[in-house]
Amino acid sequence: MAMAELSTPKTTSPFLNSSSRLRLSSKLHLSNHFRHLLLPPLHTTTPNSKISCSVSQNSQAPVAVQENGLVKTKKECYGVFCLTYDLKAEEETRSWKKLINIAVSGAAGMISNHLLFKLASGEVFGPDQPIALKLLGSERSIQALEGVAMELEDSLFPLLREVDIGTDPNEVFQDVEWAILIGAKPRGPGMERADLLDINGQIFAEQGKALNKAASPNVKVLVVGNPCNTNALICLKNAPNIPAKNFHALTRLDENRAKCQLALKAGVFYDKVSNMTIWGNHSTTQVPDFLNARINGLPVKEVITDHKWLEEGFTESVQKRGGLLIQKWGRSSAASTAVSIVDAIKSLVTPTPEGDWFSTGVYTDGNPYGIEEGLVFSMPCRSKGDGDYELVKDVEIDDYLRQRIAKSEAELLAEKRCVAHLTGEGIAYCDLGPVDTMLPGEV
C-alpha cells in the first residue's frame, strides 16, 4: 500500500504551499509550470517540508527547494502516476521488458490525442512493454496537457507507468529512447514557404540540440511536423552525437493513402497491396511508386492496365487526399496520421515480412539510388525489428521514375539551402520557386 510521509520541522504553516507537490515515481512531471493541488490541505507544514509518496522502501523523494520564500520541487505529479511500482515484485509484470521512455511534442494537439492512447495501450510496442510518456507542450497548452494526463490516468492502462509533462525540451527529452516530434507551427494565411521553413526550422534546431544533450545516445526520432523532411534534417544536424540514420520523416500516411488508391482501382482489399514506396519529399513532388508495387503478388502495371491513370490520376489522388478530407469533414487528418505514426514505428520494431518493404524519410548518405547525399528523403526500407533499418537495393528505377525522383530531390536541395543557417552549412539562400508544393490540408 502506498504511504505518504511528511517530514516537518517544529514551525508550522496553516496550509500546504500551492507550489509543493507530491513526488510520483510513476509520475506526472510539470516542467516550467506549477499546478494547484487537486487535493485538500494535508497537514500543517513549512517551506522546508519534504514530501514523498512511495510503495518501495528504496524510493527517494526529491528535496523541496526554497525560492523567494516559496517551496518548489524539481519534479511534480498527481494521482496514480505518483506511485512507485516494483515491476519485478508482481507475478503478472515480472516477465515484462524494461520500461522505455517515449517523448511526444505537440502533445496537446489532435494527432497526439489519438496517438497517446495507442502508445499507452501496448498496440505499438507490445503487450509486455511498459512505457513512460514524456509530453512536450507550450506555456499556452499546459492546461490542455494536464487534461490529456487526466484522460490517460482515467484509462487505466497497465503498461503506462509514468507521465511527465513540460515545456522545456531539455527536461522532457531526458533519457528518452523514442522521440515523436509532432509539434510545429501551422502555415498561416499569406505565409511563404520560406517563412514556414525558418519558423519551424528554429523549433527543430532547438529540439535537436535538446535531444543531443539529454536523450539516450541511440534515441530513435520520428519527425511529423511539416515540412517534415527538412525539419528532420535540421534536427539531426543539431544532434551530432546521435546517429543520423536514427532520424525519420513521416511519409507513412502517403504510403497508406497510395495503397488505398491502388486497392480501390484494382477492386481488392488494401492488404493485397505490397511493396509500396513513396520517394522524396512530403509534398506535391512526392513520388508514389507504382513500378515496384504489387497487388496480390503481381506487378501493379499487370493488374491495372490503365497506365495513364497510374501516371497521372494515381499520384494526384494521393496528393489531394488530405485536402478532400478537409472539404468533407472540415478538419485535417489527425486520426489517420496517428495511425500512420503507429505503422511507422511498428515497421521498425517488427521484422519486415519477407519480400516486402515500407517507406520512411531517412538520411541519404550511402544510398544505392544515386540520390544526392545530405538530405532526408523517403525511400524503401526493411527492418529486422530491432529499431534499425536497411535500404532496399532490389528495386527497379526506369526513366519515368528517375525523372520524378529528381524533381523531388531538387526541391529538397532548395529547402536545404533555405535553412543553411540552421544546419551549420553557411548562409541561407532561398530559391524555392513560384510553385507552392505544400500538400493540401497541411498548410
From Swiss-Prot:
Activity regulation: the record says: Chloroplast NADP-MDH is activated upon illumination. In order to be enzymatically active, disulfide bridges on the protein must be reduced by thioredoxin which receives electrons from ferredoxin and the electron transport system of photosynthesis.
Primary enzyme class: oxidoreductase
Principal cellular location given in the protein's record: plastid
Instruction: State which Enzyme Commission number(s) the record gives.
Output: 1.1.1.82
**CDD domains assigned to the protein according to its UniProt record, in alphabetical order:** MDH_chloroplast-like
**Organism's domain of life?**
Eukaryota
Localization, per the record, is:
Plastid, Chloroplast
Q: Where is the transit peptide?
A: 1-52
- Signal peptide positions are none
Q: What keywords tag this UniProt record? A: Chloroplast, Disulfide bond, Isopeptide bond, NADP, Oxidoreductase, Plastid, Transit peptide, Ubl conjugation
What InterPro entries does the database record attribute to this sequence? Lactate/malate_DH_C, Lactate/malate_DH_N, Lactate_DH/Glyco_Ohase_4_C, Malate_DH_AS, Malate_DH_NADP-dep_pln, Malate_DH_type2, NAD(P)-bd_dom_sf
The stated induction of this gene product is: By low temperature and high light.
Q: Which GO terms describe its biological process?
A: malate metabolic process; response to redox state
Q: Where is this site: Activation of NADP-MDH?
A: C77, C82
**Null-mutant phenotype, please?**
No visible phenotype under normal growth conditions and high-light conditions in short days.
Alphabetical list of Pfam families matching this protein? Ldh_1_C, Ldh_1_N
Task: Respond yes or no to whether keyword Signal is given for this record.
Answer: no
**Catalytic site:** H282
Disulphides: C77-C82, C418-C430
Q: Which SUPFAM superfamilies match?
A: LDH C-terminal domain-like, NAD(P)-binding Rossmann-fold domains
The positions annotated for binding NADP(+) are G106, A107, A108, G109, M110, I111, S112, N200, Q207, V224, G225, N226
Subunit-structure text: Homodimer.
Q: Which family does it belong to?
A: Belongs to the LDH/MDH superfamily. MDH type 2 family.
Name of the protein in its database record? Malate dehydrogenase [NADP], chloroplastic
